[in-house]
Amino acid sequence: MASAGVAAGRQAEDVLPPTSDQPLPDTKPLPPPQPPPVPAPQPQQSPAPRPQSPARAREEENYSFLPLVHNIIKCMDKDSPEVHQDLNALKSKFQEMRKLISTMPGIHLSPEQQQQQLQSLREQVRTKNELLQKYKSLCMFEIPKE
């Protein structure tokens, strides 16, 4: 099979016309390379994933239902009486998370209102970043180098 692909590739090479070393008639010399322009700061749509600290990982475990569901499935496979304890723990975790969600800021807003608020905040960040860049470019102060 590999030889058939190689043979087909060789046939394709045989079909191509030979290239000439003469320059094309309408070509112009390339301009000298210039440094790339500095792009304006853009709001990031999705931040790059950061390595998690152990405290952050433990915090996320507090919000995860997966370990409890895993324990429930294991207990059901073994016909263990602990399944009721795990089910109660899962129910209490659901209640705890409902309370936590109800205290979050902006939860009373509709998704459209949340999107509008998000766009407004992103615009504010963009404007402030632009102002900060302008302020930095004024060179009013000499920054001491240490």
UniProtKB/Swiss-Prot annotation:
UniProt KW Phosphoprotein keyword: yes
Subcellular location: Nucleus
One annotated GO biological process: positive regulation of transcription initiation by RNA polymerase II
Pfam families in alphabetical order: Med9
Alphabetically ordered keywords of this record: Acetylation, Activator, Coiled coil, Nucleus, Phosphoprotein, Transcription, Transcription regulation
InterPro entries recorded: Med7/Med21-like (IPR037212), Med9 (IPR011425), MED9_metazoa (IPR039242)
Coiled coil residues, start to end: 112-139
Annotated region described as Disordered, given as residue ranges: 1-62
Regions of compositional bias (Pro residues) in chain numbering: 26-52
PANTHER family: MEDIATOR OF RNA POLYMERASE II TRANSCRIPTION SUBUNIT 9, MEDIATOR OF RNA POLYMERASE II TRANSCRIPTION, SUBUNIT 9
Subunit and interaction comment: Component of the Mediator complex, which is composed of MED1, MED4, MED6, MED7, MED8, MED9, MED10, MED11, MED12, MED13, MED13L, MED14, MED15, MED16, MED17, MED18, MED19, MED20, MED21, MED22, MED23, MED24, MED25, MED26, MED27, MED29, MED30, MED31, CCNC, CDK8 and CDC2L6/CDK11. The MED12, MED13, CCNC and CDK8 subunits form a distinct module termed the CDK8 module. Mediator containing the CDK8 module is less active than Mediator lacking this module in supporting transcriptional activation.
Family to which the UniProt record says this protein belongs: Belongs to the Mediator complex subunit 9 family.
Protein name listed in UniProt: Mediator of RNA polymerase II transcription subunit 9
Organism of origin: Homo sapiens (Human)
Gene (UniProt): MED9
